[in-house]
């Protein structure tokens, strides 16, 4: 990868602007999950240890450009960052035209989405950002799929543009999983709709050895194979697409194993009566809400023999206890597997937390939309810009 790495640079006495993803949930001024702040600390500490004058910025929510509001302010983040770093972290409100910061100090620059032109990747604004620093560090993988002034434009104009440790760890893990995977490569793609994961399925089917589909996506594939799905969530108009994906897999010698048993209910409710049925016994008024125990075991065996596992999406309605066993079985199989494993997506991370397997998954992507776009085979604007600067 041709990207300059922050870890390789001499930052002594340099003004370093770091774009982090500090977009944390805040309720009544209280941060409810500080994972992203905690994740940013090693990068900031490293820059300080290298003797840099450090400026950090991030977006928070979706404020209106050109107007400051308390609810969109990074003030609570500055307070928490100071506590984690053990140093003062002043919040600078008006910073586009210049920032006072000395080597060994760190300042937090107010929500960059408040700046006029940020969202449209305005060149004038990007050049102003670039003029603030000697080195720009992009460390926000979660926004790498957005071409904005603080994630893309500034990379073009900064004297030096580098990838930060968080961003590079994410790119290294994804490259290891997709570009040069230990075989067999198994992907789990689940979600409510084929339509939202169509590009993902179409890209992965050309790379994987096994593709496990789950949730509403699986129902469409089950229907495509000629089985009844009752009143389960599915997309009949995408049956030809599902058949094409299966045909593409077959042509490569890859496999899309379908469930042989499922867990059904008559209503979509947490306390609905759950029944395990073989796939050919699904009634017209049944809702398929999870994979059955035999299927879960079969999938777990595939995971056990995989060299690489990419996991995006729970295979059942795991929020409801009666329909969580399929997802739990696969989660525990991934945890005990020797495979290189990468998990990403909001619901997937919730499942990782629920079954407490974060330590056992090789790499957990916090990228969200950027993670999905990478899996879809798309070029992320920030990554492309960093690669262009690294040539």
UniProtKB/Swiss-Prot annotation:
The molecule here is called Phosphoglycerate kinase
Provide the assembly information: Monomer.
Enzyme Commission numbers on file: 2.7.2.3
Q: Show the disulfide pairing.
A: none
Cite the SUPFAM superfamilies for this sequence.
Phosphoglycerate kinase
User: Which family does this protein fall into?
Assistant: Belongs to the phosphoglycerate kinase family.
Query: From which source organism is this entry?
Result: Xanthomonas euvesicatoria pv. vesicatoria (strain 85-10)
A GO molecular-function descriptor: phosphoglycerate kinase activity
Keywords linked to the UniProt accession: ATP-binding, Cytoplasm, Glycolysis, Kinase, Nucleotide-binding, Transferase
Which reaction is the catalytic activity of this chain? (2R)-3-phosphoglycerate + ATP = (2R)-3-phospho-glyceroyl phosphate + ADP
One annotated Gene Ontology cellular component of this protein? cytosol
Which enzyme class? transferase
Q: For binding substrate, which residues are annotated in this chain's numbering?
A: 21-23, 36, 59-62, 113, 146
Q: Which HAMAP family would you find in this protein's record?
A: Phosphoglyc_kinase (MF_00145)
Please tell me where ATP binds in this chain: 197, 319, 345-348
Q: Which InterPro entries match?
A: Phosphoglycerate_kinase, Phosphoglycerate_kinase_CS, Phosphoglycerate_kinase_N, Phosphoglycerate_kinase_sf
Traced from the root, the source organism's taxonomic lineage reads: Bacteria, Pseudomonadati, Pseudomonadota, Gammaproteobacteria, Lysobacterales
The source's domain of life comes to Bacteria
Q: According to its UniProt record, where is this protein mainly located? A: cytoplasm
